[in-house]
Amino acid sequence: QWNIEYVRAPEVWSAYSSSYGDAAYGYHVQVQVAVVDTGIDYTHRDLSGAVTWCVVSLSDGAIFYRGTDLKKCSDQNGHGTHVAGIVAARLNGAGVAGVAPKVTLYAIRVLSASGSGYLSDVARGIVEAVKGPDGIAGTSDDADVISMSLGGPHSDTLYEAVRYAYSYGAVLVAAAGNEGASTPSYPAAYPEVIAVGAIDSSYNVPSWSNRNPDVVAPGVSIYSTLPKNKYGYMSGTSMACPHVSGVAALVQALRLAAGKSRLSPDAMKLVLTTTARDLGPQGYDELYGYGLVDAYSAVQYALSQP
């Protein structure tokens, strides 16, 4: 799993587990990552116990559910389960491990079995994730990190949901898109969101990864979980995005474990871009943004902040 090594997550686990226990792996009672996608196969051996709550919004809100009947959020496509494994696959000696292998996940199913969906459903999913199981935004069960491996055109409804999540302190992370375009798709292009481009294991940005991201992460031939206890390789900025979501979860869990407050979305973006490993031309550039996200440097820097 070169991809987990590249973002230096195992170095966080080994450096901080003796002082902070499970927080070094992303576990904290107040830290949840919402995976806004096609659903999650919560029965997968590598995701056992990871998903605690779910939301479904499909067909422009015609199909809607929020609660703990996780079957309703099962993944008929595979994409969401693959993304979820990159964030949170458990360290159980089998299969794969995620960036934050003890973090809690919320399955927010807004894309159909074909992987497509309505921006209105994505927006609804974001809002429900922020409210969390108790239905009230601004409480400890809100999603702290919202991971969005999806993209499309601008939509006022979508932007309103992004602004809502941001106003409640949710760290929003999104795939830059795979169109080979000069700018990220939406929601990644919104200033409140961290846009993630892809690199391969040779640190090259593939031609399809949209330019001008904030940061990059591994996104080519990533091995992760698939439904029915399977595994497989997938490529795309969809795979890069959850690496960053996992790093953000590690930062928040460790800050809380250290008795500090959560980082605001702006502070998190600053920490992740400042500590990223600069690739390509010095400083920000259109291919790599600020560089490869670095979990170890990000945590170290975040814990040095008040």
Question: Where does each model-flagged region fall?
Answer:
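Extracytoplasmic low-complexity repetitive segments enriched in small/polar residues
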Residues: 14-25, 30, 34, 117-135, ...
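Stable alpha-helical elements in mature extracytoplasmic
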Residues: 8, 43, 79-83, 118, ...
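Catalytic-core segments of hydrolase enzymes
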Residues: 83, 122, 138-227, 269-277
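Active-site glycine-centered loops adjacent to acidic/histidine catalytic or metal-binding residues
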Residues: 37, 177, 236
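Hydrolase catalytic cores
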Residues: 84-87, 93, 106-112, 144, ...
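Active-site core segment of subtilase-fold serine proteases
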Residues: 2-104, 111, 121-143, 202, ...
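Sec-exported extracytoplasmic/periplasmic mature domains
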Residues: 88-92, 101, 127-135, 163-170, ...
